[in-house]
UniProtKB/Swiss-Prot annotation:
CDD domains: IGPD. Keywords: Amino-acid biosynthesis, Cytoplasm, Histidine biosynthesis, Lyase. One of its GO terms (molecular function) is imidazoleglycerol-phosphate dehydratase activity. InterPro entries: IGPD_sf (IPR038494), ImidazoleglycerolP_deHydtase (IPR000807), ImidazoleglycerP_deHydtase_CS (IPR020565), Ribosomal_Su5_D2-typ_SF (IPR020568). GO terms for cellular component: cytoplasm. It catalyses: D-erythro-1-(imidazol-4-yl)glycerol 3-phosphate = 3-(imidazol-4-yl)-2-oxopropyl phosphate + H2O. Its EC number is 4.2.1.19. Belongs to the imidazoleglycerol-phosphate dehydratase family. Pathway: Amino-acid biosynthesis; L-histidine biosynthesis; L-histidine from 5-phospho-alpha-D-ribose 1-diphosphate: step 6/9. It is an enzyme of class 4 (lyase). It comes from the Bacteria. This is Imidazoleglycerol-phosphate dehydratase. It is found in: Cytoplasm.
Amino acid sequence: MVRHASISRTTKETDIQLQFVIDGEGKAELDTGVPFLTHMLDLFTKHGQFNLTVTAKGDTEVDDHHTTEDIGICLGQALREALGDKKGIKRYGNAFVPMDEALAQVIVDLSNRPHFEFRGEFPSEKVGTFDVELVHEFLWKLALEARMNLHVIVHYGRNTHHMIEAVFKALGRALDEATMIDPRVKGVPSTKGML
């Protein structure tokens, strides 16, 4: 069974088509209109061994906020839909990823209880033209729409690009672990009998 989902979202600010495959090959086809986000999603996809296709048109003449946020919404919805009833999944994932001088950690719980925590500080407000605060917006909307508990810790680093890159790689690896099917798990991984 292929775990996948397709999401379409059209507002006055953005028009997004997104396809997501959990059990993929690390292949990304991305046209986000936000070059730095495209780069980060490519890393996320490769290191999570997902397949991700995104076509997005947004009001980037204003800034990248709406497009970045709405892609986070769509990816979260796609992850939730692709997981289905979550039977047999590991549920939890944890990954440390270094990128040169930077070290990031991402912990996820596919619990159906949305929560987002972020610890760490980026030294720069921008990477190129990309507003660094949008990393938080993207991750929060992803967690909210996927209905997952997401904790992100940037332990240290000096280069903001490296730090964010480590976060997105760790996110891919943590979600890869959490979405894996564990043959020992019978039903849903919760003593409640549901997630």
